[in-house]
């Protein structure tokens, strides 16, 4: 009999233990995630950074009530138009109508802080030209910045709940979230969705506690200065005219007498001649007058083909770059041109940001003087992404794709410009 009782007790204890274990598996943990562990350790004066739905390795700096964001974060996530002039230690910012500048200091207080070779921009300075929301917190110090407000995938919380570090009820809690809160949806799962809050938490929420995915356009009050464009009322049919000497201008009539369907001619008149940004010119006012009489617009072409200059050297040096811009506009106005066509080819990746700054600055001068600005580009490929045609399209009047050279001297035999290749180039632009 005692043996039977003992056995029954053992069975009972086992059943109770199993039940407790089973119940515990179903009870969500209420443990909170350590936020210092989550965001990472900061040195004195540093703050963790969240940009959109990403926790970043880079740190912000805090000085008193002011927050400073690393320039590479600003350029990479928020606004690429803050241009660092390293030689003169200042930030240039081109609006559609003016070029502004802010000198860097090795101390906080101003808009640009140069600390141990890293450039930081004051958050308020970034907000002056950029549509962002920022959330600043202590313990631990962190800054969350939201910058995407259109066509955002979202879910809405159906009742008060929590966001956890990982998917699963045993994962620690990151933060509470209230009914009707709109969360940014990162990934949909079977039972848990990965979401981000506007104030910088990135974690998981039970799928049954949020709505179906939706697309949200946030209402915004920020108004950026808009670019205006000089465009023609009809499609541009452009022909380049190779001019290698001033004497060649005298043959304009002969060259164009049988030309039909063209409304813009672009003579190859200008070339960057040295590393100071000086320009050699073959421009002719008489040529322009004859073209106008034939109903043609004239966009003078400038190239970077001279062996006596380095495109990187010219465009990365603000004095040389702006000398180039000034000379181009001066020559264009003197000859009575309607526009400038930039044909800078074989650009290396390291010159990409300087080329874009050149276009921004030249755009200001061209539009001040009623000149159309157009830019020639190779057909889009992965290795030419630094041309950044999307940014070009925002600051110039016409982005031109050179839809040829599919095959060339030294390549495999084939079409110069097959129709599918040209069509793909247009689609990819």
Regions found by a protein language model. Name each.
Residues 160, 201, 206-253:
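Boundary/entry segment of secreted carbohydrate-active catalytic domains
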Residues 248-273, 327-340:
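Catalytic domains of carbohydrate-active enzymes, especially glycoside hydrolases
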Residues 1-189, 219-231:
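Primary recognition of N-terminal secretory signal peptides and signal-anchoring hydrophobic helices
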Residues 237-241, 263-267, 298-302, 340-342, ...:
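Hydrophobic faces of well-ordered beta-strands that scaffold small-molecule active sites
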Residues 180, 192-197, 205:
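SH3/SH3-like beta-barrel fold
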Residues 274-280, 306-320, 410-414:
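Surface-exposed, active-site-proximal loop segments in enzymatic domains
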Residues 275, 279, 326, 349-429:
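Substrate-binding surface in catalytic domains of secreted glycosidases
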Residues 289-340, 344-345, 367-368:
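Substrate-binding cleft of extracellular glycoside hydrolase catalytic domains
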């Amino acid at each position: 009999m005692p043996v039977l009782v003992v056995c029954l007790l053992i069975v009972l204890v086992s059943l109770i233990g199993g039940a407790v274990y089973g119940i515990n598996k179903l009870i969500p943990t209420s443990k909170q995630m350590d936020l210092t562990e989550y965001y990472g350790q900061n040195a004195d004066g540093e703050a963790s950074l969240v940009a959109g739905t990403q926790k970043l390795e880079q740190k912000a700096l805090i000085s008193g009530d002011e927050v400073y964001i690393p320039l590479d974060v600003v350029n990479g996530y928020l606004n690429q138009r803050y241009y660092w002039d390293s030689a003169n230690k200042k930030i240039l910012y081109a609006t559609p109508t003016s070029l502004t500048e802010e000198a860097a200091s090795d101390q906080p207080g101003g808009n640009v802080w140069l600390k141990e070779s890293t450039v930081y921009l004051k958050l308020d300075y970034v907000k002056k030209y950029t549509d962002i929301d920022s959330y600043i917190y202590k313990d631990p110090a962190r800054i969350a910045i939201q910058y995407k407000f259109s066509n955002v995938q979202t879910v809405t919380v159906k009742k008060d709940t929590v966001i956890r570090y990982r998917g699963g009820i045993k994962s620690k809690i990151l933060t509470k979230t209230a009914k009707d809160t709109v969360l940014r949806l990162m990934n949909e799962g079977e039972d848990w969705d990965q979401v981000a809050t506007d104030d910088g938490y990135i974690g998981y929420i039970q799928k049954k506690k949020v709505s179906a995915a939706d697309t949200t356009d946030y209402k915004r009050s920020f108004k950026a200065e808009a670019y205006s464009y000089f465009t023609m009322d009809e499609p541009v049919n452009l022909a380049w005219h190779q001019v290698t000497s001033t004497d060649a201008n005298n043959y304009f009539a002969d060259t164009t007498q049988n030309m039909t369907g063209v409304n813009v001619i672009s003579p190859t008149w200008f070339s960057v001649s040295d590393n100071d940004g000086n320009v050699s010119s073959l421009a002719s006012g008489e040529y322009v007058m004859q073209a106008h009489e034939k109903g043609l617009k004239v966009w003078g072409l400038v190239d970077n083909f001279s062996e006596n200059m380095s495109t990187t050297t010219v465009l990365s040096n603000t004095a040389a770059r702006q000398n180039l811009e000034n000379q181009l506009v001066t020559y264009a106005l003197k000859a009575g041109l309607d526009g400038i066509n930039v044909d800078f080819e074989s650009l290396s990746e390291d010159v990409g940001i300087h080329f874009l700054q050149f276009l921004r600055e030249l755009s200001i001068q061209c539009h001040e003087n009623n000149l159309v600005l157009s830019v020639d580009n190779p057909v889009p490929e992965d290795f030419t992404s630094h041309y950044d045609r999307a940014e070009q399209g925002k600051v110039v009047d016409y982005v031109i794709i050179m839809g040829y050279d599919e095959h060339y001297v030294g390549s495999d035999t084939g079409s110069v410009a097959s129709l599918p290749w040209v069509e793909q180039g247009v689609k990819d632009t």
